[in-house]
């Protein structure tokens, strides 16, 4: 085999820029999910909406109120306790982590 031919500095630099290597992998290309902007203070409009809509729901829980009414979780828990005290909804299952309610029927 003949000896390897020595390249000049300019030739070496041109070879380095020629881009023979693959670019580094980017770990995250996903778009970030927008942060929810739910209400944390109950105004009269939200209160009226809760009193009007929630009695029509068949299944009522904190997550249902957060999803449908765009209110915070602590506000939803307070609203559920208030509606239960008023007799508008009745509990199905209650424990420290999750409370599930249904609408109260007139016969009960």
UniProtKB/Swiss-Prot annotation:
Top-rank lineage group of the source organism: Eukaryota
Keywords: Cytoplasm, Methylation, Ribonucleoprotein, Ribosomal protein
GO molecular function list: structural constituent of ribosome
Compositional bias per record (Low complexity), positions renumbered to this chain: 1-20
Residues that bear N,N-dimethylproline: 2
Location within or outside the cell: Cytoplasm
Record GO biological process: cytoplasmic translation
Gene Ontology cellular-component annotations: cytosol; cytosolic small ribosomal subunit
Compositional bias annotation for Basic residues: 21-30
InterPro entries named in the record: Ribosomal_eS25 (IPR004977), WH_DNA-bd_sf (IPR036390)
Assembly and oligomerization: Component of the small ribosomal subunit (SSU). Mature yeast ribosomes consist of a small (40S) and a large (60S) subunit. The 40S small subunit contains 1 molecule of ribosomal RNA (18S rRNA) and 33 different proteins (encoded by 57 genes). The large 60S subunit contains 3 rRNA molecules (25S, 5.8S and 5S rRNA) and 46 different proteins (encoded by 81 genes).
PANTHER family linked to this entry: 40S RIBOSOMAL PROTEIN S25 (PTHR12850)
Further remark: It is presumed that the precursor part of S25 is engaged in assembling of the small subunit, thus being essential in ribosome maturation. Present with 322000 molecules/cell in log phase SD medium.
Recorded family membership: Belongs to the eukaryotic ribosomal protein eS25 family.
Listed name of the protein: Small ribosomal subunit protein eS25A
């Amino acid at each position: 085999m003949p000896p390897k031919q020595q390249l000049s500095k300019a030739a070496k630099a041109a070879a380095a820029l020629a881009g023979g290597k693959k670019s580094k992998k980017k770990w995250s290309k996903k778009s970030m999910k927008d942060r929810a902007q739910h209400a944390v203070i109950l105004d009269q409009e939200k209160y009226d909406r809760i009193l009007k809509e929630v009695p029509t729901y068949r299944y009522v829980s904190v997550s249902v109120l957060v999803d449908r009414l765009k209110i915070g979780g602590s506000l939803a828990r307070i609203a559920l306790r208030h509606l239960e005290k008023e007799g508008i909804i009745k509990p199905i299952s209650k424990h420290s982590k999750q409370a599930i309610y249904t609408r109260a029927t007139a016969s009960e």
